[in-house]
Amino acid sequence: MWNQIKTDEYEGMLAETISMPGHNGDRIHAYMSRPMGKGPFPGIVLIPHMPGWDELCREITRRFTHHGYTTICPNIYERYGHGLPGEISAKAREAGGVPDESVMDDCKGALDYLHSLPYSNGRAGVIGMCSGGRHAFLAACSLKGIDAAVDCWGGGVVMSREDLTPARPVAPIDLTDKLSCPLLGIFGNDYKSPTPQQVNLHEEALKKHGKDYAFYRYDNAGHAFWYYDRDAYRPAQAMDSWEKVFEFFGKRLKI
């Protein structure tokens, strides 16, 4: 998938901050990018990770557009004020985390926005890393209008009764029977949330309910191995898994 742009091929995109409806009818900010041209284009909702609605989220939004997707990354941290992403996400953590209900409604707003665009091809996927990976799976089990979902090392899919909180009242694994689309999972074997054992439990639930899924697990990789600004970055594993993400979305959304 990399370096497949022909040298005489036109490429252009529009990337900007927009306003869209979210949880409780709130107007929230979102970062959106779309290919230039008439389309039609498939859509992707990128759910922010725990570090916040940050520069990396914007970069990944544009990366998907470079590959032909209209992409929206909603600011699920909007209710905690404005400032540097890390400061705002810290406020969310102090408050017990962004409630699942709020995130799902923000994702629904982003999906509805994508489907309303005149250049949409009618298909959309969701993806998230870290807590966003958990939310991507939860969205695929809870919302309509999702044709493919990618969970990148999402911790908290498997939860004990003691792990449940008012913000996270249900373990996503308990909703596996409601998964409505194909699922791709990307995991590092050296991480503790999720642990390889928790990934095993997730996979067992998917098999039990006969779901369409593919999990890829990488040795010598832990949490956030895509993040090139961290010591956790693993170039070979990151590149291989990005190829799998583009192949997965391409087969299911570019129809």
Regions found by a protein language model. Give the residues of each.
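N-terminal cap/leader regions of alpha/beta-hydrolase-fold enzymes
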Residues: M1-I255
